[in-house]
């Protein structure tokens, strides 16, 4: 699992962000057909970048708009509508290694912001600003239409597809464009009308992929990551219908546990935005929120607390799974964090935050320093000062990283057998010789960074 993948360049072109880890995974699997393969590949957001396009795509967009007479109001370096999204998906998933991988290994996906636009649904003020632009309606409509076609359909089981009214309508139509358009417009206008989250059971392992973008409630005094229906659905899957499960996996594009300083900074910012320190601080808070991407679980305080309570409840039950693992991406580095409950009965399950990103992208050097600093004792002290200024209560847990941060194009693998669990982290390395077995077309291969037992006997 992992997230954040720019399209790989064409053969022979230089790659400014290094080798694509999915291409290298594909090359390793293809080199030994008898070797063990992943049971499932989880892509945790930013599968495409609608707002950060390649030079080739920008040139195609210009030609297309001139010929079709469309997109005149849209940014020239971003996709504008469904037709342009189809080109973006073709570019992103068209390289031979990735096409083979997606045709060979089952996959589950969920969107994040760049699948539509950076900071998608970060706040009510942001939504109002975007809806005032002349190009936003076509962007969000095309983004949701294409997401349903290229990503979400593959998340549905055969039984779910057989009962899906939209799928039936699309199959029955000669041209399903207007059917899909009406669906996407309704999904944008009324997010509660559609559920993008879903559940998959792999034997005694349950996977819940949670939509943390479209299901938000953005009114400042009642901000939640998940609306009431979505939150109730998640709780039902975790508590009400869990049954005999050895491992519970919660896939959320945005990490639950961040570096502590970042967590408190986001909680402080949310307090400012809802007026805890007055209107002037609220205006500053909104300005800062958009520029610093302060929109993870920590920025939705009640949702963070509810998810934490739900994990503690399932982990403390008589039928507690061996592990509860939150799988995330987004932040362009990888780490392992483990919480400790400071109040109440701690869960019997081992609880982990596994964050792995990017698959094929980069992070500036200054941000690498910041991510490392965010876990330090000094940074925690700064975070506590911000929390005090924002009049924020301490959470019911504290947490430390037990691995990382790691940087580069990387992929985490969970191996679950019975009630045992093992975690592996691998990075795409360009140091291999071209043509060597298990190398991709750029001559890169996977290099092991971490291999750790998570449970006794793992």
Predicted regions and their residues:
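Metal-dependent phosphoester/phosphodiester hydrolase catalytic core
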Residues: 1-458
């Amino acid at each position: 699992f992992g997230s954040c993948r720019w399209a790989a360049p064409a053969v022979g072109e230089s790659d400014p962000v290094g080798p694509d880890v999915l291409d290298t995974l594909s090359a390793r699997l293809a080199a030994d057909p008898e070797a063990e393969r992943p049971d499932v590949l989880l892509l945790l957001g930013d599968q495409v970048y609608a707002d950060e396009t390649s030079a080739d795509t920008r040139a195609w967009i210009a030609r297309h708009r001139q010929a079709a007479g469309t997109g005149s109001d849209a940014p020239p370096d971003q996709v504008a509508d469904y037709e342009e999204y189809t080109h973006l998906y073709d570019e992103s998933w068209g390289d031979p290694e990735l096409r083979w991988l997606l045709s060979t290994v089952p996959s589950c996906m969920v969107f994040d912001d760049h699948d539509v636009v950076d900071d998608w649904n970060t706040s009510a003020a942001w939504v109002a600003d975007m809806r005032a632009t002349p190009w936003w309606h076509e962007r969000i409509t095309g983004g949701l239409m294409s997401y349903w076609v290229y990503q979400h359909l593959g998340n549905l089981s055969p039984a779910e597809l057989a009962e899906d009214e939209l799928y039936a309508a699309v199959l029955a139509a000669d041209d399903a464009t207007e059917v899909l358009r009406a669906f996407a417009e309704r999904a944008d206008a009324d997010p509660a009308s559609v559920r993008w989250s879903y559940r998959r059971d792999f034997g005694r392992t349950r996977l819940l992929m949670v939509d943390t973008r479209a299901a938000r409630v953005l009114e400042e005094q009642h901000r939640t990551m998940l609306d009431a229906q979505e939150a109730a659905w998640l709780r039902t899957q975790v508590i009400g219908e869990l049954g005999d499960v050895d491992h519970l996996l919660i896939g959320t594009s945005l990490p639950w546990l961040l570096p502590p300083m970042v967590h408190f900074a986001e909680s402080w910012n949310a307090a400012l935005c809802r007026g805890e320190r007055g209107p002037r601080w609220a205006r500053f808070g909104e300005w800062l929120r958009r520029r610093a991407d302060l929109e993870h679980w920590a920025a939705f305080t009640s949702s963070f607390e509810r998810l934490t309570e739900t994990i503690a409840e399932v982990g403390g039950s008589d039928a507690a799974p061996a592990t509860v693992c939150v799988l995330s991406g987004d932040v362009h580095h990888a780490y392992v964090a483990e919480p400790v409950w400071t109040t109440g009965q701690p869960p019997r399950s081992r609880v982990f935050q596994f964050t792995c990103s990017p698959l094929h992208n980069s992070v500036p050097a200054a941000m690498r320093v910041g991510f490392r600093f965010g876990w330090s004792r000094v940074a925690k002290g700064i975070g506590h000062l911000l929390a005090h200024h924002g009049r924020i209560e301490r959470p019911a847990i504290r947490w430390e990283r037990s691995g990382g941060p790691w940087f580069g194009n990387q992929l985490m693998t969970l191996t679950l057998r019975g009630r045992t669990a093992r975690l592996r982290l691998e990075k795409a390395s360009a140091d291999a010789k071209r043509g060597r077995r298990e190398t991709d077309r750029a001559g890169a291969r996977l290099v092991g960074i971490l291999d750790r037992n998570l449970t006794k006997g793992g």
